[in-house]
Amino acid sequence: YREAQHPIFVDDHPDKIYLHNKLLECYEKVIEHSPYPIKRIEIPWNGQEIQCLFHMTGEKNAPTVIEVPGMDQTKETFPNPVHNAFIERGMNCLVLDGPGQGKSNMRKIRPTDNNYEQVGSAVIDWLSEQEEVDATKIGISGISMGSFWGMRIAAHDSRISAIATASACFTAKTAIFEESSPRFKQMFMYMAGIDDEDKFDAMASNMTMDQHAKKIKSPSLTIMGEYDP
């Protein structure tokens, strides 16, 4: 259902609504049968709510990782409850549907060049108040566009204690939006609610780590291939 709803780039399309609702319905069964506790939560941000999945060790005061999905992923994509590398290592994991992703997309919460990190801070605020979380040990993991958003969160919020990302997408977005499959640009323009390509290009030009990377103070691990965008 997640893959089926993905290529429908139309707001309020009945097929997209149906398929996304079936995704959520199926994941309720995942929550029911998971070998550890998972909660679906709503975190307030800017007068709206960001839906997340909170995978918990069942212990108090545990280190916690914020998992940032890639551009075309949702919070249901990862981790796999049958083999959750975070839980197996004693860490909680919170996965969010950030602006433009999953439930946020359905709610028309649009990504801009800088609002994902604002949402990230709201998530950290919420985590810091939970008894299951050691607020001094909140890290970030992300893949592809999630690597960029994750790094921006770490640059924006000093409460992040460590960050590990893969398939890096930190620099100018020329490679992903102009040289890769046209689907990437088509997808992000839909997520952002922008029809004008020039307007979108102007926004995308600000989506780099320039002037932001130097603000990151936490230990950072990046896995990058030679041709990653």
Label for each model-derived stretch:
Residues 15-60:
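N-terminal cap/lid segment of alpha/beta-hydrolase-fold proteins
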Residues 61-70:
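Short beta-strand element of the alpha/beta-hydrolase
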Residues 71-84:
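The serine-hydrolase catalytic nucleophile loop
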Residues 86-103:
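Conserved alpha/beta-hydrolase
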Residues 110-136, 152:
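Alpha/beta-hydrolase active-site loop
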Residues 142-146, 150:
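Gly/Ala-rich beta-loop-alpha elbow adjacent to hydrolase catalytic centers
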Residues 152-202, 215-218:
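Hydrolase active-site cap/lid region
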Residues 197-229:
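Serine-hydrolase catalytic core
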